[in-house]
Amino acid sequence: MNQYYITECIANENASNIPLHIYTVSLLNLNQKYSFVHHIVYELRKRNANVTIAAHGQYIASFQEIVHWGDHKYIKHEYRAIECSNAAERTVLERLLKQELIERCKNEYKIYKDLFCLKTEQSIEMNEIIVHPAIYLSFTVEENGNILIGFEYQHRFEYKKTLEDLLRDRSPLIKEGVEVVDSYNKKSYYYTFVEVAPYTAGEKSPYLQQSVIDYYITKNETWKLKGVHNKTPIVHVRSQNGDIFPYLPHLLRLTCSYEQLMPSTAQQVNRIIKLPPNEKMPKLYQEIFRLLQYQNMLTFRKENVRAANLNYDIFNLSPPLMEFGRNYKTTKVSDGLGQAGVYEPKSITVSYFVDPELNYDPRKKDEILDFTKKLQHLSEKLGVKLNVSKNRVSYLGYCPFDFFKSERLSFELKSIADAFDGTVIVIGTEENIDRAYMAIKREFGAKADIMTQFVIFDSSVVKNLYYQYNVLLGIYAKSGVQPWILSDEMNSDCFIGLDVSHEHGKHASGIIQVIGKDGRMIKQKSIMTAEAGETIANRTMEEIIDESIFSYEKMYGMKPAHITFHRDGVCREDLDHLTRYMQSFQIPFDFIEIIKRPRRRMAVYTNGRWFTVQGLCYAKERMAYLCATDPRESVGMAQAVKIVQKTKCLSIRDVVSDAYKLSFMHIHSMLKTRLPITVHYADLSSTFHNRGLIHPRSVHEQALPFV
């Protein structure tokens, strides 16, 4: 018999029965309320060494009375349980429970932000990277007082070389704003790098009013001065609160995310961190209950990790039928394309832009010519005729051998952009495409509004039929071809994907619209709006709605009966304003949060074996977890998607069903995505817009320039 599990557990205790000391402090500046109260907490922790303290908003809380306040004052002190209907009080209890656990386990665990690393567990060194296995854990207090913990087995990455090593090597990785970590304490401290200080270790620091060497001698931490002399350089780093600290660079390392790893390193790391369910789940449960033994305020039963014991409604969703050419219907993309071709046959114009480094090699040139002929033949079988432009610049010997490596590539591209027609298929070596990608996307895409599809040419894979299908789907996506639609209708008429991309302090909205019950993409548009933080402004939302309804009416001759908004991440938008604006159209709607990485895993256990099931869903009230994929064991364990319904129009089952069906509309690839394409494409759209890779007034509104 199947048993359904999740990496979540409910405490035996209820928040309404846990008394704590709650102090309310006066806020001098509402705009700085978070930094202000955390400054107070920092001082209180130093004065009350054995008391666990947490804060949120204007609340400071502890399970013990805070006796020593120094110069700080509070305006109210209460000893009571929190009001579970009060979101701020729920948050302060969540933080207090987390801090209590950190304080009690810090002798056995190394704490990295939200990660608990066992000191006894061996870190893994791989190339230039150190990998630290860890447990992520979070506390959630619900409005009914239930206390849940969520957990996940994760890894933390940092560079093997210290900041001192990288500075000595003049590494390009060192630049203002990169994250660094001091791992030489019981708790790791994270900062952003600012600069190399204009003074050395033996000179007086304006921030310390003494030299850094004297500072560590005073603190009785002379072990940190090993190898340090008066002329040792000092760096300035900035804390999360904005304070500047002088630091010895050998005490800092650059942090790293998985996405930043070089492909060769990532492949090696995957063999260690991508654990299949049968390895990950038992290890994860063993480690989390070992960690929870240090939590003395709460108790947990091991059987409360079963979805049924957590009051989840458990159900399975079937893959939807998709329609291809000649009304052929199937649940498999490979079957549909192979048997009947694309849903929407048409002719498209393409141009080839070949890396001159390949073109100057006669054997490679012949292989590429053969490859392009096979692409054209296969595409014709699928129902799409590729009309090849005669303006094949690189074939005519126009570009020099090292053209893709040129320091002036952006400038050189300006003079040849007009020579191409239709979608440009850029064929090159992996190294040269990596080098030229951004320049070509900016000059051809953002400035000339030319669609480009990049193809990495590797003799060992280009003959593979699956590879050729993927290349063609990429070309079709750039050319406005609809390869398949959903045969199974959805519960909503119109879907709008929303995202705000944030990079280097810039924020921009993105949008992809999937209009109609068949999942067809009628129009995509990047909204050229710089947003404040991660909130989409009311005026931007109105523009998005106007564009969507107008496009729907143009296609179907009527307004949609229902609209679903898919928001990438947490909703920070003004839903009251959105409701009023939608009422002016008399269209009901649902606003849905799609949380891509909820740090939960779903698994099924039967006959001594753990496994994942595609289409499995755990739902509760207006929230659900969905397992939308079932990857090969070598790839690791499927990641769940969290779906939160902020409105009450459709049922949560209908909402999840629609999101699952839209994960099959990943039309630029043979692989389905675990996300509905509303959110997946909106994410790509806003990121490309933020990086200046999309034309601000593109005429290609049925193409996907960002895939």
Regions found by a protein language model. Give the residues of each.
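Long, contiguous domain-sized segments
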Residues: M1-K187, E380, V384-N387, N391-F420, ...
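Extended, highly charged clamp/arch subdomains and adjacent linkers
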Residues: L20, V178-F457, V699-V707
